[in-house]
């Protein structure tokens, strides 16, 4: 199980990304289509003023059962350990153990 502080930090990041997403996209589009260098530099300074944790790249995929960040399978939303456990217990429909 992941530490509670890490999970809370991740929730905080998700909220910040959701809150500043439209403003960040608008600034990026303005920078992309700006004509002068001075206008571009002013827009970039505005973009830098936004919180760092409001960037989507800062989010981390985590297992929804254990909260582990490593060994994450996107299709299931689980870490590798929980995927194996739940697969053996037949808790994931359509998942079968491979044998050849």
Curated annotation (Swiss-Prot):
Biological processes, Gene Ontology terms: translation
Instruction: Give all cystine bridges in this chain.
Output: none
Q: Which gene encodes it?
A: rps14
Which InterPro entries would you find in this protein's record?
A: Ribosomal_uS14, Ribosomal_uS14_bac/plastid, Ribosomal_uS14_CS
Main function: Binds 16S rRNA, required for the assembly of 30S particles.
Q: Print the keywords alphabetically.
A: Chloroplast, Plastid, Ribonucleoprotein, Ribosomal protein, RNA-binding, rRNA-binding
A GO molecular function term, named singly, is: rRNA binding
Protein location: Plastid, Chloroplast
Q: Which family does it belong to?
A: Belongs to the universal ribosomal protein uS14 family.
Q: Name one GO cellular component term.
A: chloroplast
The keyword Mitochondrion is assigned to this record: no
- One Pfam entry for this protein is Ribosomal_S14
UniProt entry tagged with the keyword Methyltransferase: no
> What PROSITE patterns does this protein's entry cite?
RIBOSOMAL_S14
The name this protein goes by in its record: Small ribosomal subunit protein uS14c
Q: How does this protein assemble? A: Part of the 30S ribosomal subunit.
